[in-house]
């Protein structure tokens, strides 16, 4: 039987680390004038995925 392919969209969006999966924040691409500076600053950078979503992403990436 052939190997299972990973979901290419998930492969581009999530990066596995020792403590979970890193991901970028949403809502930070365009039409940012109405957003406050504080909100834009909070959306900067990456964060770890919520534990309830980890199982779904592991299944998409065929990890563990």
UniProtKB/Swiss-Prot annotation:
<keyword id="KW-0687">Ribonucleoprotein</keyword>
<dbReference type="InterPro" id="IPR001706">
    <property type="entry name" value="Ribosomal_bL35"/>
</dbReference>
<dbReference type="GO" id="GO:0003735">
    <property type="term" value="F:structural constituent of ribosome"/>
</dbReference>
<dbReference type="Pfam" id="PF01632">
    <property type="entry name" value="Ribosomal_L35p"/>
</dbReference>
<dbReference type="GO" id="GO:0022625">
    <property type="term" value="C:cytosolic large ribosomal subunit"/>
</dbReference>
<dbReference type="InterPro" id="IPR021137">
    <property type="entry name" value="Ribosomal_bL35-like"/>
</dbReference>
<dbReference type="InterPro" id="IPR018265">
    <property type="entry name" value="Ribosomal_bL35_CS"/>
</dbReference>
<dbReference type="GO" id="GO:0006412">
    <property type="term" value="P:translation"/>
</dbReference>
<comment type="similarity">
    <text>Belongs to the bacterial ribosomal protein bL35 family.</text>
</comment>
<protein>
    <recommendedName>
        <fullName>Large ribosomal subunit protein bL35</fullName>
    </recommendedName>
</protein>
<keyword id="KW-0689">Ribosomal protein</keyword>
<feature type="region of interest" description="Disordered">
    <location>
        <begin position="1"/>
        <end position="27"/>
    </location>
</feature>
<dbReference type="InterPro" id="IPR037229">
    <property type="entry name" value="Ribosomal_bL35_sf"/>
</dbReference>
């Amino acid at each position: 039987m052939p190997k299972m392919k990973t979901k290419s969209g998930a492969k581009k969006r999530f990066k596995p680390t020792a403590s979970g999966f890193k991901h970028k924040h949403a809502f930070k691409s365009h039409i940012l004038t109405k957003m406050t500076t504080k909100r834009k600053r909070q959306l900067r950078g990456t964060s770890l995925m919520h534990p309830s979503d980890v199982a779904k992403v592991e299944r998409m990436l065929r990890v563990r």
